[in-house]
């Protein structure tokens, strides 16, 4: 039993905190918030025992307390007023209770009541917010209001609260700097107060949470550069203070890598992914940190899913780096330009010379052993654009390793879309590797591998439910056959007298490419099988490319039958004319296929003459 009212207050408060920490699944199934409601009742009792705060006789916040009116919400510099004396101490303790009541109501999904308590907490602390006793509590209350408004999708309001917290932290650290009181200490006897080191740890954790929430807000506002900066700061601080959930940390680092990949900052992307691998490897091996949930390591499915997701980020890294190199070295018909390759080789030395200075500016996670472990992963994967087949092959093999890892979880049974995307990435890795290969027969084999992995996908896919995916795969298979046919034609051109086997092979590849391009084009038809007069913007370019390639394919069919050849030329002309006519009616389409349109116009001009000569020749024979 408590010996005095103050002992009773402290006892009730500590019991309320303990009840607040009880996880929902430990409550009765029909009363998931039982412990929260019990904690709330005790907090209300403590509030009653403390009595009303001066100038706060249960009045509602005034109009000037709303966000944007009070300077507390704008992050303006605060004046230092210490919370000294019984009046100030009473207000602070009341604010602690209002804060916990606010969080309690939010936890039980009573957001308006939660907001009211948190705003009241801020109001009680406003003039003391820069003080050693109150700054941590004030920042935590603002952080919670930031989250609350973010969940309501009032992002600018959330931003104001969170930026105010950041400004207050920075002002406090600059002007005062000593570790402030943790809110729980207001109800602890002097001998149980926290040591400076623990206070510092808790305060830094509060600030880390602030940065984490700001990163999410900036992401939501599409301020991607700022979001990445805050995400990196959060991850770095979590490692420094050893306060992180390995699975969550690794996923956040892998997600951050995608920002750097899109910015073509491959060194930074590689560092994030390497750190993700190392930290993910800690699951089940390290001492549980304060932020780690009990579920850590206990959910095999989630573990394998996250592992697969990180693997997919690695695939994106390898694929984008290879594609970036291809774009830098290809000529206007998509083949390797040796002059561009030589120029990039000359630039490589400069890139390597600048590596150390770039590295100093780049994102860096961890120190000591952790840093060494991350570096060991980094050293196995290049961040430089590959300049030849051997360099491209190294990246390809890394990407393929992660394809197999991703497919372990993302299987066709249960994860149809994800599985297909992974297979498409695998195909894309082969496609870009083929660009670096100089041997045409080996290039053919790479495209053959692509077809072998893509064709089985559409056999089991219901086009009614997976129309877009079906179209993507049909187009990709068609293009792979198209590329193989071009390569076989190039090989045949080098032979003095191509045999019938090669001719048959070319025609079969041609036929397969036509089949899949036609399947793609047929998928654009309406229920009455009529091709649209106006092609949707999302499929305009692929539809025009398909028409162009179908036209070209008919012109490439090898036949000894003059009548058949004339029919093929007529079909080819029909498709070229479609492109020209469509672009005349829809000028916006011309911008999508400028090169193909010019070639189509040429063919529309040339083919009739060629066909007429052919008819004359046929008549003579």
UniProtKB/Swiss-Prot annotation:
Keyword set, alphabetical order: Cytoplasm, Cytoskeleton, Developmental protein, Differentiation, Neurogenesis, Phosphoprotein
Gene designation: KIFBP
Cellular localization per UniProt: Cytoplasm, Cytoskeleton
Keyword Zinc belongs to the record: no
An individual GO BP term: central nervous system projection neuron axonogenesis
Stored InterPro entries: KBP, TPR-like_helical_dom_sf
Quaternary structure note: Interacts with KIF1B; positively regulates KIF1B microtubule motor activity. Interacts with STMN2.
Alphabetized Gene3D superfamilies for the sequence: Tetratricopeptide repeat domain
Phosphoserine modification, residue list: 178
Predominant cellular place of this UniProt entry's protein: cytoplasm
One Gene Ontology molecular-function label: kinesin binding
Keyword match ATP-binding: no
UniProt xrefs under Pfam families: KBP_C (PF12309)
UniProt source species: Bos taurus
Protein name in the entry: KIF-binding protein
Superkingdom as given in the UniProt entry: Eukaryota
Family indicated by similarity: Belongs to the KIF-binding protein family.
Reported function: Activator of KIF1B plus-end-directed microtubule motor activity. Required for organization of axonal microtubules, and axonal outgrowth and maintenance during peripheral and central nervous system development.
One GO CC term on file: mitochondrion
């Amino acid at each position: 039993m408590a010996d005095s009212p103050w002992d009773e207050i402290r006892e009730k408060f500590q019991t309320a905190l303990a009840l607040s920490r009880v996880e929902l699944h430990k409550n009765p199934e029909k009363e998931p918030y039982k412990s929260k409601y019990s904690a709330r009742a005790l907090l209300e009792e403590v509030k009653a025992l403390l009595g009303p705060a001066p100038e706060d006789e249960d009045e509602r916040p005034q109009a000037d307390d709303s966000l944007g009116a009070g300077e507390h919400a704008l992050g303006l510099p605060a004046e230092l007023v210490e919370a000294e004396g019984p009046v100030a101490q009473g207000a602070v303790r009341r604010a602690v209770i209002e804060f916990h009541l606010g969080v309690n109501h939010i936890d039980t999904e009573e957001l308006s009541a939660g907001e009211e308590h948190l705003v009241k907490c801020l109001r009680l602390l406003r003039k003391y917010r820069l003080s050693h006793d109150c700054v941590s509590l004030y920042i935590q209350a603002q952080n919670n209001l930031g989250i609350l408004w973010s969940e309501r999708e009032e992002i600018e309001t959330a931003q104001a609260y969170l930026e105010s917290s950041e400004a207050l932290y920075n002002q406090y650290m600059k002007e005062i700097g000593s570790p402030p009181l943790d809110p729980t200490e207001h109800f602890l006897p002097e001998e149980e107060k926290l040591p400076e080191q623990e206070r510092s740890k808790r305060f830094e954790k509060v600030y880390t949470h602030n940065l984490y929430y700001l990163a999410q807000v900036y992401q939501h506002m599409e301020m991607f550069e700022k979001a990445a900066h805050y995400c990196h700061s959060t991850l770095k601080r979590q490692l420094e203070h050893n306060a992180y959930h390995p699975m969550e940390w690794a996923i956040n680092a892998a997600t951050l890598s995608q920002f750097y990949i899109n910015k073509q900052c491959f060194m930074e992307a590689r560092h994030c992914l390497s750190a993700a691998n190392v930290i993910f490897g800690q699951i089940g091996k390290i001492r549980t940190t304060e932020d780690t949930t009990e579920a850590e390591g206990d959910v095999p499915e989630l573990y394998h899913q996250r592992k697969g997701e990180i693997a997919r980020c690695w695939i994106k890294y390898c694929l984008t780096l290879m594609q970036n190199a291809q774009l830098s070295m290809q000529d206007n018909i998509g083949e390797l330009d040796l002059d561009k390759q030589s120029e990039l080789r000359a630039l490589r030395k400069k890139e390597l010379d600048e590596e150390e200075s770039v590295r100093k500016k780049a994102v860096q996670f961890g120190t000591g052993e952790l840093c060494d472990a991350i570096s060991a992963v980094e050293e196995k994967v290049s961040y430089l654009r590959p300049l030849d087949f051997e360099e491209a092959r190294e990246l390809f093999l890394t990407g393929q390793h992660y394809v197999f890892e991703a497919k372990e979880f993302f299987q066709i049974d249960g994860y149809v879309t994800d599985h297909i995307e992974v297979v498409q990435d695998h195909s894309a890795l082969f496609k870009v590797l083929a660009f670096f290969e100089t041997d045409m027969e080996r290039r053919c084999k790479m495209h053959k591998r692509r077809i072998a992995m893509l064709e089985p996908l559409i056999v089991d896919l219901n086009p009614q439910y997976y129309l877009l995916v079906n179209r993507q795969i049909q187009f990709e298979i068609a293009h792979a056959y198209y590329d193989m046919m071009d390569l076989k034609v190039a090989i045949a051109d080098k032979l003095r007298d191509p045999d019938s086997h090669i001719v048959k092979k070319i025609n079969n590849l041609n036929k397969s490419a036509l089949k899949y391009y036609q399947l793609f084009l047929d998928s654009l038809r309406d229920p009455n099988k009529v091709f649209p007069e106006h092609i949707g913007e999302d499929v305009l370019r692929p539809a025009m490319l398909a028409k162009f390639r179908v036209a070209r394919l008919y012109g490439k069919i090898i036949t000894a039958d003059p009548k058949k050849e004339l029919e093929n030329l007529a079909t080819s002309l029909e498709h070229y004319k479609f492109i020209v006519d469509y672009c005349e009616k829809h000028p916006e389409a011309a911008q999508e296929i400028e090169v193909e349109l010019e070639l189509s116009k040429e063919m529309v001009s040339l083919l009739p003459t060629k066909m007429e000569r052919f008819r004359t020749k046929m008549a003579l024979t």
